[in-house]
Regions:
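Metallocofactor- and cofactor-centric catalytic cores in central/energy metabolism, strongly enriched
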Residues: 3-166, 172-196, 221
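Conserved small/polar residues in nucleotide/adenosyl-binding loops
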Residues: 1-5, 247-252
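Structured, hydrophobic secondary-structure cores that serve as assembly/anchoring elements
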Residues: 215-218
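Internal alpha/beta domain cores that form substrate/cofactor-binding pockets in large enzymes
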Residues: 189-195, 202, 220-239, 243-249
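Proline-aspartate-enriched helix->loop->beta-strand connector
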Residues: 207-208
Length: 253
């Protein structure tokens, strides 16, 4: 788990951006109050468009993070933890009696500064894809979100995804963590139908016993969440969803 991170900051890119409380009661609700943060203050040139500004800030953060990573490449780490996955066929042989479980991660892809990138490709332009869970630890998924920060996943959270870590802890003990499936949350119904159909098809092809689905964002992506859940369950696969509780304690929303 990374304890240091690069934070890009500056003039607002999109409304509803977030702040990090390093002390006080708010600090208990963010992991970033406990990390060592190198903050980059980025000032936009006059007249720059929002999407150009977001991309420039995002790539500036990448360059600094890569530079810091290179400085630490030859250092001896304080702790080493091994996460190991096997091939699908090998997993069947190694764990024949354990339930086959996959993690379906829905990625924000609504545009208008609600974007996520997979190996540099805008998630809006992708189809549901199988990944090895260790790929996300190496930065396969990065965030381009600048709106509703409390309900979006920054790159740090993708790299340290708690669902992936928890599934690895149970891998080979109570379950066989087969793979991770990523899918998008596009705004048009045709895209939602296509992606949810494809996600359910992949789950069926992998002969899964159980699936955990996590959602990013709220509102429009709620549709994607339920479509994914219903279609995966229609294939006879036990499905659990992870979503957010908004506004009211009785979950009326």
């Amino acid at each position: 788990v990374y304890k240091r991170q690069v934070v890009t900051a500056g003039r607002i890119v999109g409304f509803q951006e977030g702040i990090i409380d390093m002390t006080g009661p708010g600090a208990d609700y963010t992991p970033f109050s406990k990390t060592l943060n190198l903050v980059m203050v980025c000032e936009p040139v006059e007249g720059i468009k929002q999407h150009e500004y977001e991309k420039a800030v995002r790539f500036a953060g990448f360059r600094v993070a890569a530079y810091i990573g290179e400085l630490a490449r030859e250092l001896t780490p304080d702790e080493i933890k091994v996460y190991e996955t096997c091939g699908i066929k090998e997993g069947i042989t190694q764990y024949p009696d354990l339930p086959r479980v996959a993690y379906v991660q829905m990625l924000q892809s609504q545009g208008l500064l609600h974007d996520t990138y997979v190996y540099g490709v805008d998630a809006k332009k992708t189809l549901p894809t199988i990944l090895s869970p260790t790929e996300i630890m190496d930065g396969a998924i990065v965030s381009g979100n600048c709106v509703s920060a409390c309900d979006k996943n920054p790159t740090y959270v993708h790299e340290n995804n708690p669902v992936v870590h928890d599934l690895f802890e149970e891998h080979g003990k109570t379950l066989n963590f087969v793979c991770q499936i990523i899918t998008n949350e596009n705004v048009y119904l045709a895209d939602k139908e296509r992606s949810s159909d494809w996600t359910a098809k992949l789950c069926k092809m992998l002969d899964l016993d159980g699936v955990i689905v996590s959602q990013e964002g709220f509102g429009n992506p709620d549709t994607d969440l339920i479509m994914n859940c219903k279609k995966i369950e229609a294939e006879g696969i036990k499905t659990v969803i992870i979503t957010c509780l908004l506004y009211t304690s009785d979950a009326a929303d």
